[in-house]
Amino acid sequence: MEFHRIYYFLTVAETLNFNRAAERCSVSQPVLRRPIQKLGAEFGGALFRRERGHTHLTELGKTMREFLGRVDASSQEALAAARKALGPESAPLNV
């Protein structure tokens, strides 16, 4: 499971709109869709369904949103802890 797939999935789950999610992620819609489809294949089913021009989470999508939201939050905490552990002396110097 790759983190960009999780990020793309969570962004679409939040917006329920592939166009807006693609804009927010600074990628094209096909670039956004492929990783989400692969993520769904990893879990064994579709994460979203389209109905009359609207995007909805499937039951699998709703369940995975909970779990993957925690994965995303944990990865952000890990990054913050790593930065804190390294301290200010390890920050990159920009000239």
Protein language model regions, located:
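Residue cluster at the C-terminal edge of the helix-turn-helix DNA-binding motif
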Residues: 15, 24, 37-46
